[in-house]
Amino acid sequence: MCDTKDDAQKWKCETCTYENYPSSLKCTMCQASKPLLNEDIFRLSPAQESCTVAEEAAAVEVAVMSPTPSSTCYSLQPQSQARQSNVADSEKWPCKVCTYLNWPRSLRCVQCCTKRGGEAIERGKKDMDNEADGDRAGEALQALRISGSEENLANKPVQLIGATASHRLSLSRGIDDATHLNNLANASHNQSQSQHRQPVLQQQMQLQLQPQQQRESSSSAAVPPQQQKQCYVSKWACNSCTYENWPRSIKCSMCGKTREREISGSQNDLHASSSLNSQEENQQQLQQPNVDTVSVNNSFNKKHIYQLGSSETINNCDTLQERQERRQRQIRRQVDWQWLNACLGVVENNYSAVEAYLSCGGNPARSLTSTEIAALNRNSAFDVGHTLIHLAIRFHREEMLPMLLDQISGSGPGIKRVPSYVAPDLAADIRRHFANTLRLRKSGLPCHYVQKHATFALPAEIEELPIPIQEQLYDELLDRDAQKQLETPPPALNWSLEITARLSSRMFVLWNRSAGDCLLDSAMQATWGVFDRDNILRRALADTLHQCGHVFFTRWKEYEMLQASMLHFTLEDSQFEEDWSTLLSLAGQPGSSLEQLHIFALAHILRRPIIVYGVKYVKSFRGEDIGYARFEGVYLPLFWDQNFCTKSPIALGYTRGHFSALVPMEPFTRIDGRRDDVEDVTYLPLMDCELKLLPIHFLTQSEVGNEESMMRQWLDVCVTDGGLLVAQQKLSKRPLLVAQMLEEWLNHYRRIAQVITAPFIRRPQITHYSSDGDSDEE
């Protein structure tokens, strides 16, 4: 218990009623400020000054020696000891602001808190925060044994390390706050006097500052560099699990992996260099003459708190994020960047990147994996399993699709080898010949039309190939998925055994490009057996709709109004105009999908009916019905005269947004050149599997109900023995260019068949005779 003689002069705390010593500016129990209402602001006697300075020195000594200031009582030094060390007034230094004479060891003015030879320090609300931060930092430093052992603290009580320096600073700031209030009243009165004494005071300050700076440098130099080096915890990170291990650990504490010497050595060198740099910085600070003890220790404390904080941050770092970054770096080193650059080239429309990948023998059918998508780091643009063709279709790269599709020319599963790929020169000649057959009707309907008719069919010579070769041919020619989907119950194709078997009119689904040009490709395949790669048919379609728009718009609008009334809703004229402009723009854009109106216009360009067999419902990826397809039916060239058109139709198939050409197989008797029949006939059903007539599209209100009679007018209709209404498709002689293309295509498979079926010729065994006669007998 602290004893004192003047218990009657103690002041009572207004918060906790604890009686504090007169020199205490804050309550020892609750840290509440001392009430200053009863103080005399003009009391500036020498006795009070000496007492104040003595009390300040005692408070500083208590702050330095006590480890926890809140747990012990502040034992003040007796005032008699302070009076014994009185110094003459000539040795005191006056404050340049308030002219108060301060003791030589005081670094700041007791009255106005002005720094000795500098400006007033900041005061305010940060005192409590600094004190609390100092306590926490002091505990952390003591826990890590940064400030040394207890014996060192006992032998060197002047060392100001960690929380003691910050706590002493907070106490001095608390004393300065109280004295600053007393100075506000007479600051203006003393300001004029201080101006006259300024030159004399500056000389005294320079003389008194030299011994003070020596004491400050000696006190700050008491902190050895060994203690500074101990502040940095140099743990090493495991390369496998990223666990932070202690420096002396040979193996990882988590996974048991041996520490790599090269990495650890580099880390130790790094920590050693950082510690040496910190020692050099401390030596430079100690050599500077104008640095006070408080600022040196505060900077020392803050620096080591930052180092400890950084080590704690390393120990508690987000290991998941580091593992992901490390995994991405490994992926970037292992993946094929030429392939990934090609994928990015399709997305970013970089033609050269795709061309560079294909020129080096890259496979256009290669699909993306999850690892490669992680390396690309663009999940919104790429999906697992996507190829360059998928990306080109998704991002509408119409100029890249022909190049990618041309690369699909090898053999193997999923690789297509259509006749136009085997004989590209002949296919180009066929497209050029077709372009020359297009004409424009000048009188009447200004519509493009073809001058010659052709119908494509698979050659009968396929039956002469071996069965394995036939299977390979069909795999590389047909679209098996579309064929299966059209024949799946309820079937839309080859559902009548009478038509397929007895009448030999089975239809095959040809593969074509999976793009928005599939309708035009299928129309060209059904007639000439090639793709519309030069967009000849698309340009003719766009020109026809623009030049004959007034004729097509009237019938299209009436048909759409009729379909809307069947679904019990109506459309406004503005909606019709908007939809019509959309249809016109789609016709002129290569790669864009086409609608029913475009099939109706194609029937006029080809001058023949078009029969579409398709699914009735559009399904999602999960197999759920999401809407009506409405493409199945008969499209007649109603704007032409019947005598101007042929009655031999072509057949197309529709499956979930994709059109395919439906072609028959030529009868085997066609190979015989002595036959009398010039044309072969294929029978196309005009009824569905439920024996209902196929709808005729774009009929007016007056024409509805006369579907069968209109079919008989525009088609060669007959009825089978089973009562099915069918249309006759005439197969005439092949055009010369088409025959040459098919012959070259068949020769490819004939060569494969010869290699497989050729007999194995064994080499004759040659007998070698020795020159020795005895060995010959043996």
UniProtKB/Swiss-Prot annotation:
Pfam family, one: AnkUBD
Bias type Low complexity, positions: 198-226, 273-288
Gene3D superfamilies in the record: 1.25.40.560, Zinc finger, RanBP2-type (4.10.1060.10), Zn-finger domain of Sec23/24 (2.30.30.380)
Active-site residues per Swiss-Prot or TrEMBL entry: C518 (nucleophile), H658 (proton acceptor)
Known function: Positive regulator of the Wnt signaling pathway. Specifically cleaves 'Lys-63'-linked ubiquitin chains. May act by deubiquitinating APC protein, a negative regulator of Wnt-mediated transcription. Required for an efficient wg response, but not for other signaling responses, in the eye.
Family: Belongs to the peptidase C64 family.
Name assigned to this protein: Ubiquitin thioesterase trabid
Annotated source species: Drosophila melanogaster (Fruit fly)
